[in-house]
């Protein structure tokens, strides 16, 4: 039972200063007032807007959101009145004086400064776009970053007035990909340049391959494993490190964000990974009277328990509310970490993930197993069912779920949300098949895709099947591995994995004489399910068998150049 020491809190009247608004700052200020009418609460915001829908900004640029006013979640006037807050916009905190417990505030329009005392100081400065020192960047006349409403206004005004024909987006993270879509919505040709070999870092390469395929369908030019060497001719020419040249009318720089931690650093507060502000489980910095929340802080990864930076709106909002509770005496409120659950729209595709990916687990030397399952978003016999591909990453011995990724046109978000909830509750892959999820033909199947991926993972944990991954099978076949494709002959026109032998599943029992007993057998099909059935059949006959996880569909999407016909 959570305990709040009400009498002690109510007898105290404190001056609480919140630095920064939007998700974290606005959330903590509102909750603080709901918990106490006595405290003096001051919110100091460098910009003009204290609370806006930063995740909606690309969609206003693209014309999907048509009313600018809808981006403004709270105005200064409305929030001041409702919550009795002293809100000071266009005011920047330039110094923290820890010993005196004061801050120095600068009016950004007049440059005048003054000091303000505090009993409790809360930092919610957020994160800012990374702007590297690219030669020619200062001379680029149509180069933009996207963080706030003024940035949005500048980009939209440029598009409306100049009507650019081509845009270059540098960076393939969430903001970059969302900007690509919304620029295409405006009829602008787009080239995306990304240093890595994929978009959207939270998902793994093979899942991103589906996103790449979808973006190409929407006429987006993708340039991977290349960076910007220089901007020339006032930013109308982008010269890449490979020597390639892109002629463009505008540039969106979206290579990532860095924490706004200089204020904390100058005050001597301890910093963490990537320059984040280091905090404990109660959001206290190295100074017990100074707290920090939001994109600028170091958080614990819920899965690996390592320190990291996860700049997302969900954690910032929850941290704000929790910190207000902590300040008001909730003795057992502790922040247990962030899983980084996220979702993004990429044209007609929804892409979501939770937990950690393979890249992180490899870096930390944590052993793991992977399974891919493709199932319909709802019952296949009900109209308009579309495939959902789910990737589950887990511990083969314990069944602990490390992470999940999913993509499709419909029903993706709710599947990831269910798995995220299971992870938070410390459920294992063995528990997923028993989750009693809502079912009716328009919404799901009697065995939901979450149940199905649980069955597939449980089969591995229980030893009913072994698998190999899409990136392993070519090497195996090249070194003498015996690969059977159990699809029907008419399916082979889609292509095959080089070196595979076709024995349709329903003929396999009658053709066992063609399957050598002295070799390990590998099975592939279209998606993996028939491969599992074939693997079980052969295992019962005494064969050593492994199933190609995800089947030919996964292999062919990720490695189309290796498919044979």
Regions found by a protein language model. Name each.
Residues 11-92, 130, 180-203, 332, ...:
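Beta1-alpha1 glycine-rich phosphate/pyrophosphate-binding loop at the start
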Residues 139-163, 234-239, 245-322, 418, ...:
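FAD-site-proximal beta/loop scaffold in flavoenzymes
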Residues 430-441, 445-472, 476-482, 489-520, ...:
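Rhodanese-like catalytic fold shared by cysteine-dependent sulfurtransferases
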Residues 38-40, 82-84, 88-109, 116, ...:
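A Rossmann-like FAD-binding core segment of flavoenzymes
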Residues 123-186, 221-222, 279-281, 501-505, ...:
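Glycine-rich dinucleotide-binding loop and its adjacent helix/turn
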Residues 72, 166-168, 174-230, 312-316, ...:
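Rossmann-like dinucleotide-binding cores of NAD(P)H-dependent redox enzymes
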């Amino acid at each position: 039972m959570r305990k709040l020491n009400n009498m002690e809190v109510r007898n105290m009247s404190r001056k609480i200063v919140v630095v920064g608004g939007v998700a974290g700052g606005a959330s903590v200020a509102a909750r603080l007032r709901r918990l106490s009418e006595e405290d003096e609460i001051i919110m100091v915001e460098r910009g003009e807007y204290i609370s806006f829908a930063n995740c909606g900004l690309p969609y206003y640029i693209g014309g999907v959101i048509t009313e600018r006013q809808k981006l403004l979640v709270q105005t200064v006037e409305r929030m001041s009145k409702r919550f009795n807050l002293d809100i000071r916009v266009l005011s920047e905190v330039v110094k923290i004086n820890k010993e005196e417990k004061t801050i120095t505030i600068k009016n950004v329009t007049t440059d005048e400064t003054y000091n303000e005392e505090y009993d409790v100081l809360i930092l919610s400065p957020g994160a800012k776009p990374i702007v590297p020192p690219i030669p020619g960047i200062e001379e680029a006349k149509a180069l933009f970053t996207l963080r706030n409403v003024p940035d949005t206004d500048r980009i939209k005004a440029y598009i409306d007035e100049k009507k650019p024909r081509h845009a270059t987006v540098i960076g393939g993270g969430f903001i970059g990909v969302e900007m690509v879509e919304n620029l295409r919505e405006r009829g602008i040709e787009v080239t995306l340049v990304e240093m890595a070999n994929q978009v959207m870092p939270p998902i793994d390469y093979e899942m991103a391959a589906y996103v790449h395929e979808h973006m190409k369908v929407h006429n987006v030019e993708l340039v991977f494993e290349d960076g910007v060497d220089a901007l020339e001719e006032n930013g109308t020419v982008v010269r890449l490190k490979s020597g390639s040249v892109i002629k463009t009318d505008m540039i969106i720089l979206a290579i990532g964000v860095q924490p706004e931690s200089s204020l904390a650093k100058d005050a001597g507060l301890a910093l963490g990974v990537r320059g984040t502000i280091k905090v404990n489980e109660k959001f206290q910095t190295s100074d017990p009277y100074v707290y920090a929340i939001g994109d600028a802080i170091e958080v614990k990864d819920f899965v690996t328990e390592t320190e990291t930076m996860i700049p997302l709106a969900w954690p910032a909002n929850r941290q704000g509310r929790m910190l207000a509770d902590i300040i008001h005496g909730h003795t057992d409120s502790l922040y247990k970490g962030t899983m980084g659950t996220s979702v993004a729209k990429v044209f007609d595709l929804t892409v979501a993930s939770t937990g950690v990916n393979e890249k992180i687990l490899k870096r930390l030397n944590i052993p793991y197993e992977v399974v891919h399952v493709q199932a319909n978003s709802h019952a296949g016999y009900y109209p308009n069912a579309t495939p959902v591909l789910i990737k589950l990453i887990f511990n083969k011995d314990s069944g602990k779920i490390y992470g999940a990724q999913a993509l499709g046109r419909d029903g993706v978000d709710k599947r990831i949300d269910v798995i995220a909830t299971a992870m938070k509750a410390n459920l294992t892959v063995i528990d997923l098949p028993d989750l009693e999820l809502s079912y009716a033909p328009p919404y799901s199947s009697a065995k939901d895709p979450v149940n199905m991926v649980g069955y597939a993972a449980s089969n591995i944990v229980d030893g009913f099947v072994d698998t190999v991954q899409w990136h392993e099978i070519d090497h195996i076949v090249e070194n003498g591995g015996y690969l059977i494709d159990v699809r029907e002959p008419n399916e082979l026109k889609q292509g095959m994995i080089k070196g595979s032998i076709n024995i349709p599943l329903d003929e396999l029992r009658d053709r066992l004489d063609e399957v050598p007993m002295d070799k390990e057998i590998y099975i592939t099909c279209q998606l993996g399910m028939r491969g599992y059935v074939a693997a079980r059949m052969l295992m019962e006959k005494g064969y050593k068998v492994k199933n190609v996880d995800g089947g030919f569909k996964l292999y062919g999407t990720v490695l189309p150049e290796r498919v044979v016909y």
